[in-house]
Regions:
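Phosphate-coordination loops involved in phosphoryl transfer and adenosine-cofactor binding
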Residues: 86-89, 193, 256-257, 303
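Accessory substrate-recognition/RNA-binding modules or partner subunits associated with SAM-dependent
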Residues: 2-138, 142-147, 151-167, 315-336
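Short amphipathic alpha-helix with an adjacent loop that forms part of the alpha/beta core around
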Residues: 81-83, 295-304
Length: 338
């Protein structure tokens, strides 16, 4: 079976390495994703265990779609009875335009009509449209008048780990945070017993993702929804086995004792980080506290990783105050962490 894993820009090599670790073969890297081959188990493992992927897609058909009629016919060439069970719900995501399909909403409607018309004709029933957590989410990409129709096995973006109860302004996406931790060498540092410190932790994403990594916790294990659960081709026994395996690995990983801390001057951010950590079932594993950057010291020893996402862009605020923040951060790094 052939699949496609979408991912953030600049992360494809990390995603490809993860996929190969899950058993994928013939991985091909693109700017924002990885094409790969594997069994359904490989795809399920990617949904459950990938720390960097955004979505896992199962391509069903690729065809010329110069206009709406060609799009409709191409979508109808797929046997939807093999994928959408009776009384299921359906959503369509459509990306891309062309001279004669100039709006994504129009493309999505045409795709939906083709699917619904086929199912009504063959089964006498039609799926209901449900934008939020449907049984089956169909993904259509239109590029240079060629359409690729896929099933979205993830259902919603895999960066949504289900632990973020509250966020802060412009939070870092979880899969991007995980990729940055990988680039910084955190897995090897954690394996050697090193510490993790984020002195500007916001809602705690770096520390929580670092803990999930260090303790061998599947990032998708907290999620209650995946796009394949309502799919007619879903293998329930296989998924149950993978969930049980993830539970056993989580229990084994809890024996690891590492110092993983996050500080922030904002009391609201710290409350959010603590709540997020509790939802991730990391109470007593990670530590968050309100602490000003000016009093930052190294009380974690000489082996570890300091990582931070300082304010920029949407979070820039007062530019003069920001200059002071960066100056203080540089001073504390030179003083305590060289």
């Amino acid at each position: 079976m052939q699949f496609f894993a979408s991912c953030p820009l600049g992360v494809a090599d990390l995603t490809a390495a993860e996929l190969r670790n899950f058993g994928a073969s013939r991985t091909s890297e693109y700017k924002r994703g990885v094409q790969f081959e594997g069994t359904l188990e490989v795809a399920y493992r990617a949904c459950l265990w990938s720390r960097t992927a955004s979505r896992i897609l199962l391509p069903l058909a690729t065809f010329p779609a110069p206009d709406a009629d060609a799009l409709y016919a191409g979508v109808q060439s797929v046997d939807w009875t093999a994928h959408i069970a009776p009384r299921s719900t359906l959503a369509v995501e459509f990306a891309g335009t062309s001279p004669r399909i100039s709006h994504t909403h129009f493309g999505a409607l045409k795709t939906k009509d083709a699917i619904v018309d086929q199912l009504r004709e063959r089964t006498g029933e039609r799926p209901s449209i449900e934008v939020d957590r449907p049984s089956v989410r169909v993904d259509v990409r239109l590029d240079r008048e060629r359409a690729t129709v896929s099933l979205d096995l993830s259902g919603e973006s895999l960066h949504r780990r289900a632990y973020r109860a509250r966020g802060v302004a412009a939070p870092l996406k979880e899969n991007l945070a995980a990729a940055i931790l990988m680039r910084a060498g955190w897995p090897a540092i954690a394996e050697a017993g090193g510490a993790l410190l984020d002195p500007m932790c916001g809602s705690g994403t770096f520390v929580i993702e670092g803990a999930l990594m260090a303790l061998d916790i599947a990032p998708g294990s907290l999620r209650s929804y995946f796009g394949f659960v309502g799919w007619a081709g879903h293998d329930r026994a296989l998924w149950a086995r993978l969930i049980e395996e993830a539970r056993e690995r989580r229990e084994a990983g809890r024996n690891r004792k590492l110092a993983m801390r996050g500080y922030d001057r904002d009391a609201f951010a710290i409350r959010a980080a603590i709540e997020n950590a509790e939802r991730a079932k990391l109470r007593g594993v990670v530590h968050f506290e309100r602490r000003e950057l000016q009093v930052l010291t190294n009380d974690l020893g000489s082996r570890g990783l300091l990582i931070a996402n300082p304010p920029y862009g949407e979070r820039i605020g007062d530019k003069e105050a920001l200059q002071g923040v960066y100056a203080t951060l540089g001073e504390k790094l030179r003083e305590h962490f060289e």
